[in-house]
Amino acid sequence: MGRGARLSELSAKAIHSQVVEVRGHIIDSQILPRILDDILDSECEFVIEEMRVGRTRGDPSYARVEITAPTAEALNEIVARVRQVGAQPVQTGQAKLEPAPTDGVFPLDFYSTTNLQTTVNVGGRTLAVANPEMDCGVLVEGNSARCLPLSEVRKGQMIVVGHQGVTVMPLERPRGPSSTFAFMSSSVSSEKPRAGLIHDLAREIRQVKSEGGKVLVVAGPAVVHTGSGELLVRLISGGWIDYLFAGNALPTHDIEWALYGTALGVSLTEGLPLERGHEHHLRAINRIRHEGGIASAVRKGVLTKGIMYACETHGVDYVLCGSIRDDGPLPEVCTDVIECQQAMRQRIHSGVRVAIMLSTMLHSIAVGNLLPAHVTTVCVDINPAVVTKLADRGTFQSLGLVMDVGSFLRELLDDLGRPQDR
Protein backbone atom coordinates (compact mmCIF):
# COMPACT_ATOMS: atom_id res chain seq x y z
CA MET A 1 0.00 0.00 0.00
CA GLY A 2 1.51 3.36 -1.04
CA ARG A 3 5.07 2.90 -0.01
CA GLY A 4 4.33 -0.80 0.12
CA ALA A 5 4.19 -3.31 2.86
CA ARG A 6 7.91 -3.10 2.56
CA LEU A 7 9.63 0.16 1.64
CA SER A 8 12.88 -1.56 0.68
CA GLU A 9 14.76 -4.77 1.29
CA LEU A 10 15.99 -5.00 4.85
CA SER A 11 19.60 -4.04 5.17
CA ALA A 12 21.97 -6.83 6.14
CA LYS A 13 23.17 -4.62 8.98
CA ALA A 14 19.65 -3.86 10.24
CA ILE A 15 19.33 -6.63 12.79
CA HIS A 16 17.54 -4.77 15.58
CA SER A 17 13.75 -4.77 15.32
CA GLN A 18 10.63 -3.99 17.33
CA VAL A 19 6.97 -4.52 16.45
CA VAL A 20 4.61 -1.66 17.27
CA GLU A 21 0.88 -1.30 16.81
CA VAL A 22 -1.48 1.63 16.56
CA ARG A 23 -5.28 1.79 16.74
CA GLY A 24 -7.96 4.37 16.12
CA HIS A 25 -8.72 6.77 13.29
CA ILE A 26 -5.09 6.56 12.25
CA ILE A 27 -5.47 7.36 8.55
CA ASP A 28 -7.64 10.48 8.32
CA SER A 29 -5.97 11.85 11.47
CA GLN A 30 -2.59 11.43 9.72
CA ILE A 31 -1.25 9.35 12.61
CA LEU A 32 -0.04 6.36 10.57
CA PRO A 33 1.58 8.49 7.81
CA ARG A 34 3.40 10.49 10.48
CA ILE A 35 4.70 7.30 12.11
CA LEU A 36 5.99 5.97 8.80
CA ASP A 37 7.58 9.31 7.93
CA ASP A 38 9.31 9.40 11.32
CA ILE A 39 10.73 5.92 10.69
CA LEU A 40 12.09 6.94 7.29
CA ASP A 41 13.46 10.22 8.58
CA SER A 42 15.43 8.22 11.16
CA GLU A 43 16.99 6.13 8.37
CA CYS A 44 15.25 3.04 9.70
CA GLU A 45 12.96 0.71 7.76
CA PHE A 46 9.51 -0.73 8.28
CA VAL A 47 7.30 -3.64 7.30
CA ILE A 48 3.54 -3.34 7.70
CA GLU A 49 2.72 -6.80 9.03
CA GLU A 50 -1.01 -6.23 9.38
CA MET A 51 -3.40 -3.48 8.33
CA ARG A 52 -7.14 -3.28 8.97
CA VAL A 53 -8.94 -0.20 7.68
CA GLY A 54 -12.27 0.84 9.19
CA ARG A 55 -15.13 0.54 6.71
CA THR A 56 -17.28 3.35 8.11
CA ARG A 57 -16.57 6.73 9.70
CA GLY A 58 -17.08 5.27 13.15
CA ASP A 59 -14.88 2.20 12.66
CA PRO A 60 -11.32 2.38 14.02
CA SER A 61 -8.38 1.16 11.97
CA TYR A 62 -5.43 -0.95 13.09
CA ALA A 63 -1.84 -1.29 11.93
CA ARG A 64 0.95 -3.56 13.11
CA VAL A 65 4.37 -2.37 11.97
CA GLU A 66 7.80 -3.94 12.35
CA ILE A 67 10.55 -1.34 12.70
CA THR A 68 14.09 -2.35 11.82
CA ALA A 69 17.17 -0.30 12.72
CA PRO A 70 20.92 -0.72 12.27
CA THR A 71 21.71 -0.32 15.99
CA ALA A 72 19.96 -0.83 19.31
CA GLU A 73 20.36 2.88 20.07
CA ALA A 74 18.70 3.88 16.80
CA LEU A 75 15.85 1.45 17.46
CA ASN A 76 15.26 2.79 20.96
CA GLU A 77 15.27 6.34 19.63
CA ILE A 78 12.72 5.74 16.87
CA VAL A 79 10.46 3.64 19.10
CA ALA A 80 10.44 6.44 21.66
CA ARG A 81 9.67 8.92 18.87
CA VAL A 82 6.69 7.05 17.39
CA ARG A 83 5.30 6.42 20.87
CA GLN A 84 4.82 10.17 21.15
CA VAL A 85 2.04 9.98 18.54
CA GLY A 86 0.37 6.80 19.78
CA ALA A 87 2.31 3.78 18.48
CA GLN A 88 2.81 1.14 21.17
CA PRO A 89 5.35 -1.69 21.31
CA VAL A 90 3.67 -5.08 21.39
CA GLN A 91 3.76 -6.56 24.90
CA THR A 92 4.72 -3.36 26.72
CA GLY A 93 4.91 -5.10 30.12
CA GLN A 94 4.97 -3.37 33.49
CA ALA A 95 6.16 0.17 34.06
CA LYS A 96 9.37 0.45 36.03
CA LEU A 97 9.54 2.80 39.00
CA GLU A 98 12.53 4.36 40.73
CA PRO A 99 12.67 6.79 43.65
CA ALA A 100 13.74 10.37 43.02
CA PRO A 101 17.31 10.66 44.34
CA THR A 102 16.81 14.14 45.80
CA ASP A 103 14.47 17.13 45.68
CA GLY A 104 14.16 18.58 42.19
CA VAL A 105 15.85 15.64 40.47
CA PHE A 106 14.24 12.77 38.54
CA PRO A 107 15.89 9.36 38.19
CA LEU A 108 18.30 9.57 35.25
CA ASP A 109 16.22 7.34 32.96
CA PHE A 110 12.87 9.01 33.77
CA TYR A 111 10.04 8.84 31.25
CA SER A 112 9.53 12.29 29.69
CA THR A 113 5.85 12.97 29.08
CA THR A 114 3.90 14.38 26.16
CA ASN A 115 0.72 16.44 26.46
CA LEU A 116 -1.33 13.47 25.17
CA GLN A 117 -3.49 11.26 27.36
CA THR A 118 -1.27 8.55 28.82
CA THR A 119 -1.64 5.39 30.91
CA VAL A 120 0.93 3.39 32.87
CA ASN A 121 0.74 -0.30 33.74
CA VAL A 122 1.72 -0.70 37.39
CA GLY A 123 1.31 -3.95 39.29
CA GLY A 124 -1.17 -5.27 36.75
CA ARG A 125 -3.31 -2.12 36.99
CA THR A 126 -3.74 0.43 34.23
CA LEU A 127 -3.52 3.92 35.70
CA ALA A 128 -4.55 7.01 33.75
CA VAL A 129 -1.95 9.75 34.12
CA ALA A 130 -3.72 12.85 35.41
CA ASN A 131 -2.96 16.41 34.27
CA PRO A 132 -1.25 15.63 30.93
CA GLU A 133 1.60 18.05 30.25
CA MET A 134 4.69 17.89 28.08
CA ASP A 135 8.20 17.63 29.51
CA CYS A 136 7.29 16.27 32.93
CA GLY A 137 7.83 13.01 34.78
CA VAL A 138 5.14 10.53 35.89
CA LEU A 139 4.61 10.22 39.64
CA VAL A 140 2.94 7.04 40.91
CA GLU A 141 1.34 7.19 44.35
CA GLY A 142 -0.79 4.22 45.41
CA ASN A 143 -3.53 3.75 42.82
CA SER A 144 -2.95 7.03 41.01
CA ALA A 145 -0.48 8.57 38.58
CA ARG A 146 0.00 12.16 37.46
CA CYS A 147 2.38 14.37 35.55
CA LEU A 148 4.91 15.98 37.85
CA PRO A 149 7.09 18.97 36.89
CA LEU A 150 10.79 18.68 37.64
CA SER A 151 10.64 21.59 40.09
CA GLU A 152 8.05 19.79 42.24
CA VAL A 153 9.59 16.32 42.61
CA ARG A 154 10.69 15.37 46.12
CA LYS A 155 13.23 12.84 47.27
CA GLY A 156 11.84 9.31 47.47
CA GLN A 157 8.80 9.86 45.23
CA MET A 158 8.33 6.96 42.81
CA ILE A 159 8.86 8.04 39.21
CA VAL A 160 8.30 6.03 36.02
CA VAL A 161 11.57 5.23 34.23
CA GLY A 162 12.02 4.03 30.66
CA HIS A 163 9.16 3.47 28.20
CA GLN A 164 8.04 0.01 29.26
CA GLY A 165 4.44 -0.15 30.44
CA VAL A 166 3.62 3.36 29.18
CA THR A 167 0.82 3.85 26.64
CA VAL A 168 0.19 7.15 24.84
CA MET A 169 -3.23 7.78 23.26
CA PRO A 170 -3.02 9.50 19.85
CA LEU A 171 -4.95 12.72 19.35
CA GLU A 172 -7.49 11.94 16.66
CA ARG A 173 -9.37 14.27 14.39
CA PRO A 174 -13.05 14.74 15.34
CA ARG A 175 -15.40 12.56 13.31
CA GLY A 176 -17.98 13.68 10.78
CA PRO A 177 -18.35 16.80 8.64
CA SER A 178 -20.09 18.75 11.40
CA SER A 179 -17.46 18.04 14.05
CA THR A 180 -16.35 21.21 15.76
CA PHE A 181 -12.73 22.01 15.07
CA ALA A 182 -12.08 19.33 12.47
CA PHE A 183 -9.50 21.82 11.21
CA MET A 184 -7.26 21.53 14.26
CA SER A 185 -3.54 21.17 13.54
CA SER A 186 -3.96 22.61 10.06
CA SER A 187 -1.12 24.63 8.59
CA VAL A 188 -0.72 28.35 9.15
CA SER A 189 -1.81 30.68 6.38
CA SER A 190 -3.02 34.25 6.12
CA GLU A 191 -5.08 33.27 3.07
CA LYS A 192 -7.39 30.77 4.74
CA PRO A 193 -11.09 31.64 5.00
CA ARG A 194 -11.42 32.76 8.59
CA ALA A 195 -15.13 33.37 9.02
CA GLY A 196 -15.95 29.67 9.20
CA LEU A 197 -13.12 28.97 11.61
CA ILE A 198 -14.19 31.75 13.97
CA HIS A 199 -17.79 30.57 13.73
CA ASP A 200 -16.66 27.07 14.75
CA LEU A 201 -14.70 28.52 17.65
CA ALA A 202 -17.79 30.40 18.84
CA ARG A 203 -19.78 27.18 18.64
CA GLU A 204 -17.07 25.37 20.63
CA ILE A 205 -17.10 28.06 23.31
CA ARG A 206 -20.89 27.84 23.64
CA GLN A 207 -20.73 24.07 23.98
CA VAL A 208 -17.92 24.18 26.54
CA LYS A 209 -19.70 26.81 28.64
CA SER A 210 -22.99 24.90 28.53
CA GLU A 211 -21.17 21.82 29.84
CA GLY A 212 -19.48 23.67 32.68
CA GLY A 213 -16.04 23.88 31.05
CA LYS A 214 -13.71 26.84 31.27
CA VAL A 215 -12.37 29.25 28.63
CA LEU A 216 -8.90 30.76 29.00
CA VAL A 217 -7.55 33.86 27.25
CA VAL A 218 -3.82 34.58 27.07
CA ALA A 219 -3.38 38.18 25.98
CA GLY A 220 -0.54 40.56 25.19
CA PRO A 221 -0.40 44.37 25.29
CA ALA A 222 -1.10 44.60 21.55
CA VAL A 223 -4.75 44.02 22.47
CA VAL A 224 -4.67 47.46 24.12
CA HIS A 225 -2.31 49.16 21.65
CA THR A 226 -4.60 48.32 18.72
CA GLY A 227 -7.65 49.72 20.48
CA SER A 228 -9.15 46.25 20.90
CA GLY A 229 -9.35 46.34 24.68
CA GLU A 230 -13.05 47.20 24.65
CA LEU A 231 -13.73 44.09 22.56
CA LEU A 232 -12.03 41.88 25.14
CA VAL A 233 -14.02 43.70 27.83
CA ARG A 234 -17.22 42.71 26.03
CA LEU A 235 -16.13 39.06 25.98
CA ILE A 236 -15.46 39.22 29.71
CA SER A 237 -18.68 41.05 30.60
CA GLY A 238 -20.63 38.61 28.41
CA GLY A 239 -19.53 35.75 30.63
CA TRP A 240 -17.53 33.97 27.93
CA ILE A 241 -14.14 34.13 29.66
CA ASP A 242 -13.18 32.37 32.90
CA TYR A 243 -9.43 33.00 33.15
CA LEU A 244 -7.02 35.64 31.87
CA PHE A 245 -3.27 34.99 31.72
CA ALA A 246 -0.98 37.92 30.95
CA GLY A 247 2.26 39.61 31.89
CA ASN A 248 2.81 43.03 33.43
CA ALA A 249 2.42 44.91 30.14
CA LEU A 250 -1.24 44.14 29.36
CA PRO A 251 -2.66 45.36 32.69
CA THR A 252 -0.24 48.29 32.77
CA HIS A 253 -1.25 49.63 29.37
CA ASP A 254 -4.90 48.82 30.01
CA ILE A 255 -4.80 50.86 33.22
CA GLU A 256 -2.82 53.60 31.46
CA TRP A 257 -5.63 53.81 28.93
CA ALA A 258 -8.28 53.85 31.67
CA LEU A 259 -6.53 56.67 33.56
CA TYR A 260 -4.97 58.72 30.75
CA GLY A 261 -6.54 57.58 27.47
CA THR A 262 -3.17 56.48 26.10
CA ALA A 263 -1.15 53.30 25.55
CA LEU A 264 2.62 53.83 25.65
CA GLY A 265 1.86 57.54 25.55
CA VAL A 266 -0.13 57.38 22.30
CA SER A 267 -3.75 58.54 22.34
CA LEU A 268 -6.03 55.66 21.36
CA THR A 269 -8.64 58.09 20.00
CA GLU A 270 -6.35 60.35 17.95
CA GLY A 271 -3.46 57.97 17.30
CA LEU A 272 -0.93 60.67 18.22
CA PRO A 273 1.66 60.77 21.00
CA LEU A 274 0.81 63.17 23.80
CA GLU A 275 3.20 65.54 25.52
CA ARG A 276 4.84 63.71 28.45
CA GLY A 277 2.84 60.67 27.40
CA HIS A 278 5.90 58.49 27.79
CA GLU A 279 5.44 58.88 31.57
CA HIS A 280 1.88 57.62 31.62
CA HIS A 281 2.56 53.88 31.96
CA LEU A 282 4.84 54.40 34.96
CA ARG A 283 2.42 56.86 36.53
CA ALA A 284 -0.36 54.30 36.05
CA ILE A 285 1.71 51.63 37.83
CA ASN A 286 2.56 54.04 40.63
CA ARG A 287 -1.09 55.03 41.13
CA ILE A 288 -2.18 51.40 41.40
CA ARG A 289 0.64 50.67 43.85
CA HIS A 290 -0.44 53.74 45.84
CA GLU A 291 -3.99 52.38 46.03
CA GLY A 292 -2.81 48.95 47.18
CA GLY A 293 -3.38 47.01 43.98
CA ILE A 294 -5.83 46.59 41.12
CA ALA A 295 -8.67 45.19 43.23
CA SER A 296 -8.34 48.00 45.75
CA ALA A 297 -8.27 50.63 42.99
CA VAL A 298 -11.54 49.23 41.63
CA ARG A 299 -13.17 49.25 45.07
CA LYS A 300 -12.07 52.85 45.68
CA GLY A 301 -13.41 54.03 42.32
CA VAL A 302 -9.97 54.95 40.98
CA LEU A 303 -10.12 52.33 38.22
CA THR A 304 -13.52 52.48 36.52
CA LYS A 305 -13.08 50.86 33.11
CA GLY A 306 -10.91 48.58 31.05
CA ILE A 307 -9.93 44.92 30.94
CA MET A 308 -8.73 44.62 34.54
CA TYR A 309 -11.79 46.51 35.80
CA ALA A 310 -13.99 44.05 33.90
CA CYS A 311 -12.12 41.08 35.38
CA GLU A 312 -12.60 42.40 38.91
CA THR A 313 -16.27 43.27 38.48
CA HIS A 314 -17.23 40.06 36.64
CA GLY A 315 -15.30 37.56 38.72
CA VAL A 316 -12.77 36.59 36.05
CA ASP A 317 -9.70 35.07 37.70
CA TYR A 318 -6.36 36.27 36.32
CA VAL A 319 -2.71 35.29 36.63
CA LEU A 320 -0.14 37.98 35.88
CA CYS A 321 3.42 36.72 35.43
CA GLY A 322 6.36 39.10 35.54
CA SER A 323 9.65 39.23 33.65
CA ILE A 324 13.04 40.90 34.00
CA ARG A 325 12.00 43.73 31.66
CA ASP A 326 8.98 44.90 33.68
CA ASP A 327 8.51 48.39 35.08
CA GLY A 328 7.04 48.38 38.57
CA PRO A 329 5.60 45.84 38.43
CA LEU A 330 1.95 46.07 39.42
CA PRO A 331 1.24 44.58 42.88
CA GLU A 332 -0.73 41.63 41.50
CA VAL A 333 2.12 40.57 39.20
CA CYS A 334 3.91 37.44 40.42
CA THR A 335 7.68 37.68 39.97
CA ASP A 336 8.53 34.08 40.93
CA VAL A 337 8.41 31.96 37.75
CA ILE A 338 7.83 28.69 39.63
CA GLU A 339 4.88 30.22 41.49
CA CYS A 340 3.57 31.53 38.16
CA GLN A 341 3.70 28.05 36.63
CA GLN A 342 1.94 26.56 39.64
CA ALA A 343 -0.79 29.21 39.53
CA MET A 344 -1.38 28.66 35.82
CA ARG A 345 -1.40 24.87 36.19
CA GLN A 346 -3.99 25.14 38.97
CA ARG A 347 -6.36 27.08 36.70
CA ILE A 348 -5.73 24.86 33.68
CA HIS A 349 -6.43 21.69 35.69
CA SER A 350 -9.73 23.12 36.95
CA GLY A 351 -11.48 22.40 33.66
CA VAL A 352 -10.02 24.60 30.90
CA ARG A 353 -11.19 23.24 27.55
CA VAL A 354 -10.60 26.24 25.25
CA ALA A 355 -7.49 28.44 25.20
CA ILE A 356 -7.28 31.57 23.03
CA MET A 357 -3.85 33.18 22.58
CA LEU A 358 -3.99 36.84 21.54
CA SER A 359 -0.87 38.57 20.18
CA THR A 360 1.72 37.42 22.70
CA MET A 361 4.40 35.03 21.46
CA LEU A 362 6.39 34.22 24.59
CA HIS A 363 3.38 33.97 26.89
CA SER A 364 1.52 31.82 24.35
CA ILE A 365 4.42 29.38 24.09
CA ALA A 366 4.79 29.25 27.88
CA VAL A 367 1.10 28.53 28.45
CA GLY A 368 0.95 26.18 25.46
CA ASN A 369 3.62 24.04 27.12
CA LEU A 370 1.29 23.57 30.10
CA LEU A 371 -1.84 22.65 28.14
CA PRO A 372 -3.08 19.08 27.59
CA ALA A 373 -3.42 18.20 23.91
CA HIS A 374 -7.21 17.85 24.19
CA VAL A 375 -7.63 21.57 24.99
CA THR A 376 -8.88 23.44 21.92
CA THR A 377 -6.11 25.98 21.34
CA VAL A 378 -6.27 28.96 18.98
CA CYS A 379 -3.36 31.37 18.46
CA VAL A 380 -4.15 34.73 16.83
CA ASP A 381 -1.37 37.01 15.63
CA ILE A 382 -0.71 39.29 12.68
CA ASN A 383 2.76 37.71 12.36
CA PRO A 384 2.68 34.18 10.87
CA ALA A 385 6.01 33.35 12.52
CA VAL A 386 4.37 33.59 15.95
CA VAL A 387 1.63 31.05 15.31
CA THR A 388 4.15 28.75 13.61
CA LYS A 389 6.50 28.91 16.59
CA LEU A 390 3.75 27.83 18.99
CA ALA A 391 3.27 24.59 17.08
CA ASP A 392 7.02 24.13 16.61
CA ARG A 393 7.59 24.38 20.37
CA GLY A 394 5.33 21.40 21.05
CA THR A 395 1.75 22.70 21.08
CA PHE A 396 0.99 20.77 17.90
CA GLN A 397 -2.78 20.80 18.49
CA SER A 398 -2.99 24.58 18.11
CA LEU A 399 -4.73 26.33 15.24
CA GLY A 400 -3.01 29.46 13.97
CA LEU A 401 -5.02 32.40 12.67
CA VAL A 402 -2.92 35.06 10.96
CA MET A 403 -5.01 38.19 11.36
CA ASP A 404 -5.41 41.41 13.29
CA VAL A 405 -6.49 40.72 16.87
CA GLY A 406 -9.18 43.40 16.72
CA SER A 407 -10.80 41.85 13.65
CA PHE A 408 -10.71 38.44 15.30
CA LEU A 409 -12.35 39.64 18.52
CA ARG A 410 -15.00 41.58 16.62
CA GLU A 411 -15.95 38.56 14.48
CA LEU A 412 -15.96 36.26 17.50
CA LEU A 413 -18.23 38.63 19.42
CA ASP A 414 -20.59 38.86 16.46
CA ASP A 415 -20.87 35.06 16.33
CA LEU A 416 -21.33 34.70 20.08
CA GLY A 417 -23.91 37.49 20.11
CA ARG A 418 -26.29 35.99 17.58
CA PRO A 419 -29.53 35.16 19.46
CA GLN A 420 -30.26 32.06 17.37
CA ASP A 421 -26.86 30.59 18.34
CA ARG A 422 -27.25 31.05 22.04
Segments predicted by a language model, with ranges:
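Glycine-rich phosphate/diphosphate-binding loops that line cofactor/substrate pockets in enzymes
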Residues: 200-215, 310-313, 347-352
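Gly/Ser/Thr-rich loops at beta-strand to alpha-helix junctions
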Residues: 25-29, 51-56, 71-72, 166, ...
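Short acidic, glycine/serine/threonine-rich loops at helix termini
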Residues: 79, 132, 170-174, 227-231, ...
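C-terminal functional extensions of proteins
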Residues: 267-316, 323-354, 358-422
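Active-site histidine-anchored catalytic micro-motif
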Residues: 215, 233-236, 240-286, 357
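Extended, charged alpha/beta regions that create polyanion-binding interfaces
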Residues: 82-179
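Gly-rich Lys/Arg/Thr-decorated short loops/hinges at beta-loop-alpha junctions or inter-strand turns
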Residues: 16, 175-190, 211, 285-291, ...
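A conserved regulatory-domain signal marking ACT and ACT-like small-molecule sensing domains
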Residues: 2-99
